[in-house]
A protein has these predicted regions:
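FIC/Doc superfamily catalytic core
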Residues: 1-268
C-alpha cells in the first residue's frame, strides 16, 4: 500500500493501518531526520551487506587519482549532471566551454556554472544553509527556471516534480536545518549509506525553485570526499545516474511511498 495512504488511514483511526506501520517500524532503524509529516525516515541497517561493502572498498582502493584526473572528472561530472537536466551540449564541445568560457547556449552556461559550483565547494570549509544558498546562486546563474518561485533563501511556492509533490514552503527552514544537523551529527555505519540518505532527503525536500538535481549530486560527492573517501573526486556520479535514470527515479519513488524507508534508494 502507498505510504501516504497508509499514513492517512492510521491518522483516521484505522487499526490495521496503524498495526502495519508499527510492524514495519520494528524491522527498521529510525533516523533523527523527519519527513514533512513529522515522521522519522527509516532504513534497514542490512541494506548494504558486508560482502558488498568489502567489494566496493576493494574497487575504491584501486582508483588512482591525480590532479589531472580530478580536473577531468569535475568537467565530466558537470557535463553529465547538466545532461540529466536537459542540456544538449555534446562531449566534443566541452573544450570550448572550459577553455574559451563559451556560454552561447543555455546548456553551456549550465555546465560552466556547475563546474564553478564544484570549485566553490573545494575552497569553502562551511557546510550550512548559507553555503547551500550560495551554491544555488552559482548553479542557476543566468539559467534559472521557475525564477518566479525564487524566495529569499528557498523557493517561495510549492512545486510538483513528476509524481512527487515537494513539501510546503513553510517547512523548508526547519527541514533544511535537519538536513545539516543530520549531515554533521548522526553516526551511520558507512558513508555510502549516509550519502544515500542525504541525497534522498534533499531531492525529497526540493528546497529551491530550480537546480535541485545538480545540487543534490554535487553534495553527495562532496559528502563522500569529506568523509575520507577522497578518490571519489576522480569519479563521475552523474554519468552513472544518467545511464540508469529509470532505476534511479524508481528507487526515489519507492522510498517515498514505502513508509519513507530509504532502503530502496540506498540499494540503488
Amino acid at each position: 500500500m502507498n505510504y501516504k495512504l497508509l499514513e492517512r488511514d492510521a491518522r483516521l483511526g484505522d487499526y490495521h493501518a496503524k498495526k502495519r506501520l508499527e510492524q514495519r517500524m520494528e524491522q527498521l532503524e529510525t533516523l533523527s531526520i523527519r519527513d514533512a509529516l513529522g515522521y522519522p525516515l527509516t532504513y534497514a541497517p542490512s541494506a548494504l551487506p558486508a560482502q558488498l561493502l568489502a567489494d566496493i572498498d576493494k574497487m575504491y582502493d584501486n582508483i588512482s587519482v591525480t590532479s589531472i584526473d580530478t580536473e577531468v572528472s569535475i568537467e565530466e561530472e558537470s557535463f553529465h549532471s547538466c545532461r540529466i537536466e536537459g542540456a544538449t551540449t555534446t562531449i566534443d564541445e566541452l573544450f570550448d566551454i572550459f577553455k574559451a568560457k563559451r556560454t552561447e547556449k543555455k546548456g553551456d552556461r549550465m555546465i560552466l556554472n556547475t563546474y564553478r559550483a564544484v570549485k566553490y565547494l573545494n575552497i569553502t570549509s562551511r557546510r550550512d544553509v548559507d553555503t547551500l544558498v550560495q551554491l544555488w546562486k552559482i548553479v542557476t546563474d543566468g539559467v534559472c527556471d521557475n525564477a518566479g518561485l525564487s524566495g529569499e533563501k528557498f523557493r517561495s511556492g510549492n512545486v510538483v516534480v513528476g509524481t512527487h509533490e515537494a513539501p510546503d514552503v513553510e517547512l523548508l527552514d526547519y527541514c533544511m536545518k535537519q538536513f545539516f544537523d543530520f549531515c554533521h551529527g548522526e553516526n551511520i555505519s558507512h558513508p555510502y549509506t549516509k550519502a544515500a540518505i542525504l541525497h534522498f532527503y534533499f531531492v525529497y525536500m526540493h528546497p529551491f525553485c530550480d537546480g535541485n538535481g545538480r545540487i543534490s549530486r554535487l553534495l553527495t560527492t562532496d559528502f563522500l570526499i569529506h568523509s575520507g573517501l577522497e578518490n571519489f573526486s576522480a569519479l563521475t556520479l552523474s554519468k552513472t545516474i544518467n545511464e540508469t535514470s529509470a532505476a534511479y527515479y524508481q528507487a526515489l519513488e519507492n522510498s517515498e511511498n514505502n513508509f519513507h524507508d530509504v532502503t530502496p534508494f540506498i540499494q540503488y
